[in-house]
């Protein structure tokens, strides 16, 4: 047995994929990239089972199985096959051997990352490594294999006949805020930045350095309740809303301010001009620090580069090109029915293949210190096994035709369209999964 998706480049892969796709009769009426999906999943049976469930354990089992069924046939087959092709497998596993120094900042500290929250530099290093891997391997062959370079702006619409959705979504937002901000009387309260302060930051970025002489909050050194200068938070918000290029615009405005101060010393009180320049330079440095932490410490699940992390885990666990097909088969079977963390560990322990215990050794500690929402994207958990499944387990590479049976992994759901002209299958499926109040109350 061996990997049957034999291709070293896109041309060879397309030649392999054409007869394969015709045999599977792929379609794209409900998904962005062609899939096996021919209808929006019907989860009525799961809803009935949920209503009859008597405890949380049973409810979790019902929901997990419903998630598998909801995502079983919607995976992007072309992209999954490319990710598992012999050329990508060989190049990716070799890439980590050759780039140990490039990933050292977080790879060498993996045992620490299993236990606690990463440093921002370790997150930035991960992102840089992921981009280098994509370029070196030649992974990006179409719009669905490219990494994002700009924010995704999308409006999700839920059919009005669905009851309790507003209440449910409000509760989900509240729970998210508790995760982000902690529990207590201030939990869920978002720190608001005045529109007036944002306008001030935009004017500064626009080259109007004179706004620093009279900021809307008064003293340029004034801090908010967090102890952070208001000038710094205003600049951070502008960069967040309008793009990181605004940082360079602000830096240029401060250089213009410095030159103006040097040329107009007589118009300023002794020493005040240089003091102002130093103050704004300090605030700019604070802005850079805050921006780095703000960008890096957003939910790490959202920042995970799924194929890159999947290959990192495979490499770290000792998977070789010759044994890759066994991992693919394991993940394919994992997508046939839901497995909790304990069953996952038991299955990995039972396999005679060395990568089984290798993956277990990568799992984050049960007593992880801090908010797991901020766990480094290179750290594996039983839940993140689904990320690997979405890459390597949709098509069992030793027998690709078996993909017709489907394999459910949560990230597959992102392939559903959000187009209302086809009844927004993405929103419809998600709503079916979470509309039952028993799941979220």
Swiss-Prot record:
Entry's cofactor comment: Stimulated by divalent cations such as Mn2+, Co2+, and Mg2+.
Keywords from the UniProt entry: Capsid protein, Helical capsid protein, Ribonucleoprotein, RNA-binding, Viral nucleoprotein, Virion
Record's subcellular location: Virion
Cofactors named for this entry: Mn(2+)
A GO-annotated cellular component: viral nucleocapsid
Domain of life of the source: Viruses
Site-annotated residues for Homooligomerization: 213, 277, 352
GO MF annotation terms: RNA binding
Record-annotated site: Cleavage by host CASP3/caspase 3: 269-270
Reported modifications of this chain: Cleaved at the DEVD motif by host CASP3/caspase 3 in mammalian cells giving rise to cleavage products that remain associated. Only the monomeric form is cleaved. Little or no cleavage in tick cells. Caspase cleavage reduces the viral polymerase activity. Caspase cleavage is not required for productive infection in mammalian or tick host cells.
Statement: the UniProt record of this protein carries the keyword Cell membrane: no
Motif (DEVD): 266-269
Domain notes: The DEVD motif is a CASP3/caspase 3 cleavage site essential for viral replication in host cell. However, the importance for viral replication is apprently not linked to caspase cleavage. This motif is involved in homooligomerization.
Family of the protein in this entry: Belongs to the nairovirus nucleocapsid protein family.
Function: Binds dsRNA and ssRNA and probably participates in the packaging of viral genome. In the dsRNA binding mode, the nucleocapsid protein specifically binds to the vRNA panhandle secondary structure formed at the termini of viral genome. Does not discriminate between viral and nonviral RNAs through ssRNA binding mode. Displays dsDNA endonuclease activity that is sequence non-specific.
Subunit structure: Probable homooligomer; forms a double superhelical polymer. Monomer.
Protein name: Nucleoprotein
Organism of derivation: Dugbe virus
